[in-house]
Amino acid sequence: MSQLLTSRQAEELHKSMIAYLNSANLLHSAATLREELDIGESFDSATSKKYEGLLEKKWTSVVRLQKKIMDLESRNAALQSEIDNATPTSLSNRNTDPTAWLPKSPARHNLQSHREAITCVAFHPVFSSLASGSEDCTIKIWDWELGELELTVKGHTRAVLDVDFGGPRGGTLLASCSSDLTIKLWDPSDQYKNIRTLPGHDHSVSAVRFIPSGAAGSPSSGNLLVSASRDKTLRIWDVSTGYCVKTVRGHADWVRDVAPSYDGRWLLSAGVDQTARIWDASSGEPKATLLGHENTIECCVFAPPASYPHLAAMAGLKKPPAASSSAEYIATGARDKSIRIWDARGTLIKTLIGHDNWIRALVFHPGGKYLLSVADDRTLRCWDLAQEGKCVKTISDAHGHFVSCMRWAPSVIKDAPLLNGENGVGTPIKNGNGATKKEDAKGSDIDCTSLMPQIPSI
């Protein structure tokens, strides 16, 4: 013992042992130990009280440290195994090419608080905040970096069907829409206070998106919002006044989804009538109608310019469109279990088959090479556009139930998180740049799959 402990440490250990024996009412043993250690009358009741409980604290600390060591050893072994199984090329790509990074299991966080199915998720454009909407009529705000609930926002009287962050520069707002026929605007800078309610739709409002600044006819940059409804219409709103500035008609049934182009010039909508439609955002006039799906189209998205080289090659073109063009290619996902890629004239380029149930959400990878999808088959799939849309990765354990939504955070590639959601009660956040939402029959989760590229790792 003298080789391991200093004289002071040895003295404290001896006194702790004696104090422990006294507290255990083993007085004879305590006296014997004092005699053997030559600890005299200086060890009085005050000294005994000082050292009482110290031995137990040291013991429990050792147990905690042993557990921590075991956990770290297990994590180290898993990381070593990953390194051993990786090729030099894959390691190089992981460390130098975030544009090729793809999500993987396990989830980083599992966020639980909703009491019914989660229907939608959205990232704050600046802060590490994540909003989730649910059939329990609430919106919950989470810190997706910490995996903690920050706030529950109440106001809707029926299921919240979609949420989106946006608004004028320097004045970010949260918009939500609901089966209660309303759209509500919330102020993140004031504890998500409800600052405006937009009535006008005649049925459930299924989707809502801020239109990026630059749209022709915008009364003020960043002030436009578009909504899609079961009343078969799209409506464009001025969030500064709350007025509906345009109603767009053309769909023959429920409009399930709407997406603006990156410059705000075009709108893409899709719905139960099995069509996707491209509209001029300033005039509301149709540009193209996409026909081919055999069931309800659940989701639609414009391809970013970074995807143009891959999609142009897939379409058989020698030269991709100019990056300044914002509505050249489109992807749609439907209840016919297929994903279809189109050009802006409505020509079908490719049909991607692989999901076993309804396609619920699509996002293009910020690097442009991949298209990611989630579906009611509980999977997240990654399609390589440079390989004719080949499915190069499937996360089969993304959720324990239907995966109902997915979003990629509006950020630079190295920071951009992805979020997808499901009918359940928890939210796993996966290592990477994004988030996913998971739900089961007992409640609602948000599976925030933070799909961050490995540079830097978090």
From Swiss-Prot:
Belongs to the WD repeat LIS1/nudF family. GO terms for biological process: cell division; establishment of mitotic spindle orientation; microtubule organizing center organization; microtubule sliding; nuclear migration; vesicle transport along microtubule. InterPro entries: Dynein_regulator_LIS1, G-protein_beta_WD-40_rep, LIS1_N, LisH, PAC1-like_LisH-like_dom, WD40/YVTN_repeat-like_dom_sf, WD40_repeat_CS, WD40_repeat_dom_sf. Positively regulates the activity of the minus-end directed microtubule motor protein dynein. May enhance dynein-mediated microtubule sliding by targeting dynein to the microtubule plus end. Required for nuclear migration during vegetative growth as well as development. Required for retrograde early endosome (EE) transport from the hyphal tip. Required for localization of dynein to the mitotic spindle poles. Recruits additional proteins to the dynein complex at SPBs. This is Nuclear distribution protein PAC1. Residues 436-445 have a biased composition (Basic and acidic residues). SUPFAM superfamilies: Lissencephaly-1 protein (Lis-1, PAF-AH alpha) N-terminal domain, WD40 repeat-like. Keywords: Cell cycle, Cell division, Coiled coil, Cytoplasm, Cytoskeleton, Microtubule, Mitosis, Repeat, Transport, WD repeat. SMART domains: WD40 (SM00320). Residues 60-87 form a coiled coil. It is found in: Cytoplasm, Cytoskeleton; Cytoplasm, Cytoskeleton, Spindle pole. GO terms for cellular component: cytoplasmic microtubule; kinetochore; microtubule associated complex; nuclear envelope; spindle pole.
